Amino acid sequence: MKKLCVWAVAALLMAACTPKAEKATDSGLLQSNFQMEVNGKKTDLYTLRNKNNMEVCITNFGGRIVSVMVPDKDGQMRDVVLGFDSIQDYVSKPSDFGASIGRYANRINQGKFTLDGTEYQLPQNNYGHCLHGGPQGFQYRVFDAVQPNPQELELTYVAEDGEEGFPGNITCKVLMKLTDDNAIDIRYEAETDKPTIVNMTNHSYFNLDGDAARNEAHLLTIDADYYTPV
């Protein structure tokens, strides 16, 4: 009987010491792969989910949408955006995948602009032009994150006066909400202490047939009177 008790205690101790397997998101992501430190600030992975079990995963590194699991026409869940599986991949393979772009999205010709009579010279990181806020734009910064409920995430980044050549201290907020009609609502707010320019956007790469499929045969229709050639 004593030997049986010893074995029972040993089994209980082994069970107590065995770490519980980490549960992956529906898109197969592990939160631990997104928990590290970049430039002295902690990164993480945040998951939004609505009543339809649609899932959106976001990291505060660059305010990036990492995955979007949405039902297709047959009800099968598909990840319809491109993204990496870890922060290390985002750091070691620079890209704009899913990022919150700022301070100024798109190109600024020759990296120059004039505001209130003052000419500003920005980094020329794209064939002589300034692209997406420069080589260290918001997409490579760590945002402060607050998740007030399962369907919303608030991201905040404070850019200092002169960062990437832009004037003014500026507090930028990215408010992401997953609605119950399977839409991702993204709103941008910016507050500055002096005249500046700001133009933020999200840079997700979509594949509406799922990330494992090729998208060369997709047809995109833009319901607009005008568009800006790039």
Regions found by a protein language model. Give the residues of each.
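Sec-dependent signal peptide recognition
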Residues: K2-A8
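C-terminal motif of bacterial Sec signal peptides marking the signal peptidase cleavage site
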Residues: M14-A16
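An exposed, glycine/acidic-rich loop-and-rim segment of catalytic or binding clefts
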Residues: T18-M54, N60-V230
